[in-house]
């Protein structure tokens, strides 16, 4: 792979055409060697069939149908992405295919070793032979796995399309209700004007108030109707879509069996208690009433009398509680037990 400098980045190394003079020029690369060639040179050199790479000292046989547009500026990243796509298409097992997590981790490690060797040119022939051998031995399993994944992707695409239609239906209902509300307001306004033209001046305020109340009642009623309609649409969507049912079942299962290494963000039943006087009294009174049932910390006691610390919200109990938390947190944490 050739390292490019900034000056030759926008110039074809074969025909020396510059992108400044030809703004529509596109560069193509071939996964065989990842040398950058402009599109016109590819058409000129490889239209009649396979030909060697025009780069000096390369000589790899390239085919026109293998050329593609460069996506990443760094060709090293481009090469690694292509290798990962190829290897993941062959080693396409997931965690569901393994009974033990350790076996799955070993499988992932072996896949990463293959990618690393191919990307860095380490034992290329041996790695390629092992890759081809595995593909030939597990061809049926690979095809079955690809079919299952394509089915999942198809279900996901259908689910996304249904979600889009659901949103469109909600927007359509909302717009229709807004149009009807505007028509109702115009009708109320016209009726109010007709009544005011024939009513006495004493009754005009009552008519205006009554009209405003009717509009408010109508608005609140329409909001409730809109909420009911949207909830009905959501229920119909959830009941008719199998993908959403599966996602909801997985979510419910995750909610039923939570796992956190420290039992959540707090312990409801702590393994320690404050001494009675410290727990009840304020931080300023702890040291004055210190006795047998208290714990006296000379340094912290001085800070408890400092107005600068107290003004910032610091309290002596907070310091004691933090020290005890650091001492006791995690002592009763058994990860294997929590997982089960």
Swiss-Prot record:
Subcellular localization, as worded in the UniProt entry: Nucleus
Stored PROSITE patterns: ZF_RING_1 (PS00518), ZF_RING_2 (PS50089)
CDD domains: RING-HC_TFB3-like
RING-type zinc finger segments: 12-57
GO function term, MF aspect, one: cyclin-dependent protein serine/threonine kinase activator activity
A biological process from GO: regulation of transcription by RNA polymerase II
Source domain of life: Eukaryota
Coiled-coil annotated spans: 124-206
GO cellular component: transcription factor TFIIK complex
SUPFAM superfamilies, A to Z: RING/U-box (SSF57850)
Keyword terms of this UniProt record: Coiled coil, Metal-binding, Nucleus, Transcription, Transcription regulation, Zinc, Zinc-finger
Main location (coarse class): nucleus
Keyword Nucleus among UniProt keywords: yes
Role, per record: Acts as a component of the general transcription and DNA repair factor IIH (TFIIH or factor B), which is essential for both basal and activated transcription, and is involved in nucleotide excision repair (NER) of damaged DNA. TFIIH as CTD kinase activity and DNA-dependent ATPase activity, and is essential for polymerase II transcription.
NCBIfam families reported for this sequence: cdk7 (TIGR00570)
Descriptive protein name: RNA polymerase II transcription factor B subunit 3
Source organism of this protein record: Debaryomyces hansenii (strain ATCC 36239 / CBS 767 / BCRC 21394 / JCM 1990 / NBRC 0083 / IGC 2968)
